[in-house]
Design a protein with these regions (language model features):
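Short alpha-helical elements
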Residues: 1-270
Length: 270
C-alpha cells in the first residue's frame, strides 16, 4: 500500500533523471564494478556517469547517438556497455544481487525452486536473428526467463521467436546449473510438458495447468510470479521491442534491467 513513507522512499524527483543512480544505489553497486587499470590512459569519465548513461538508454529507449550532451560520448558509453556484455558483468552483477536480496529477505542465498516462462516481442529493422512465433503471431524474438519464487531473475535467454518453449527451455535449465546449482524444482506451463525438458537436467519440472473450469484469464499459482517480472522489466522503453542487432546485446539489456530492480530494492533496505 502506498503511504507517505513509501512514496518518500520511492521518490526520484531529486535526481537529474529518474534512471540515475542515487547515492545509496551507487554504494550498493560500486564494490562489484571493475577497478581502474593501473596502466594505460586514465578514465576520462566516472564509472557512475557511464552507468547513468547506460541506464538512461535502457529506461528511455533512446538510441545511443541521442544521449543528452551532459552524459559521456555515446561511443564511449556503448563501448563500456559492450565490454560489460562480453565480460559477462551484467550476468555476474545480477547473480550477486539476487543472492544479497534473498539474504536480505531472510531466504537462503541460492534458491531451491524457480519458475520459467517466455515472452515474444517484435524486432525492428536492426537485423540479427529472428523468427515467427506461430502461436502468438509475432515476428521477432523470444525472451526466456527463470525467476525464483519471489520473482528475482535467475537466468535470462533470448532466441528467435520461432524456437518453441520446450526447445528454448533446455539451454535455460542447463545454464542454471552453473550459477544456481541448488534449484531442485521448476514450475512451468503446459508448453514445457515434453520429454526433452524433463530430461534436460536433474531439475524436476512441475507443470502448473489451468483450472478445469477456467474461462478467460485467471491468476494461476506460481506462474504469475514470472509474468510479474516480465511486466516489471517492460517498463523500460528499450525493452518495449527488441531493438538490438545481436542476441548478446538483447540478453545484456535484460540483465541490466534486472540489476536496476535489485539495486533499488537493496538500496531502499539499507
Amino acid at each position: 500500500m502506498w503511504t507517505p513513507e513509501t512514496r518518500t522512499r520511492h521518490d526520484r524527483d531529486h535526481l537529474r533523471y529518474g534512471s540515475d543512480l542515487s547515492d545509496e544505489e551507487w554504494r550498493v553497486l560500486a564494490p562489484f564494478l571493475p577497478p581502474p587499470a593501473h596502466t594505460g590512459r586514465r578514465r576520462l569519465w566516472p564509472m557512475r556517469e557511464m552507468l547513468n548513461a547506460i541506464f538512461y538508454v535502457l529506461r528511455s529507449g533512446c538510441p545511443w547517438r541521442l544521449l543528452p550532451e551532459h552524459f559521456p560520448p555515446h561511443q564511449t558509453t556503448y563501448r563500456w556497455f559492450t565490454r560489460f556484455r562480453d565480460d559477462g558483468l551484467w550476468e555476474s552483477l545480477n547473480h550477486q544481487f539476487v543472492m544479497l536480496d534473498r539474504e536480505r529477505a531472510g531466504r537462503e542465498a541460492s534458491p531451491s525452486a524457480a519458475i520459467i516462462d517466455s515472452q515474444s516481442v517484435k524486432t525492428t529493422e536492426s537485423g540479427g536473428p529472428r523468427g515467427f512465433d506461430a502461436g502468438k503471431k509475432v515476428k521477432g524474438r523470444k525472451r526466456h526467463a527463470m525467476v525464483d519464487t519471489d520473482g528475482r531473475a535467475l537466468v535470462l535467454h533470448v532466441h528467435p521467436a520461432s524456437v518453441q518453449d520446450r526447445d528454448g527451455a533446455v539451454p535455460l535449465l542447463q545454464a542454471s546449473r552453473r550459477s544456481f546449482p541448488f534449484v531442485e524444482r521448476v514450475f512451468a506451463d503446459s508448453a514445457y510438458n515434453a520429454e526433452r525438458v524433463a530430461h534436460a537436467t536433474s531439475i524436476v519440472v512441475e507443470i502448473v495447468r489451468k483450472l478445469p473450469d477456467q474461462v478467460g484469464f485467471a491468476v494461476l499459482p506460481r506462474r504469475w510470479v514470472v509474468e510479474r517480472f516480465l511486466a516489471w522489466i517492460n517498463r523500460n522503453r528499450r525493452l518495449a521491442k527488441d531493438f538490438e542487432a545481436t542476441l548478446a546485446s538483447a540478453t545484456a539489456f535484460l540483465y541490466a534491467a534486472s540489476v536496476m530492480l535489485l539495486i533499488r530494492r537493496l538500496a531502499r533496505a539499507s
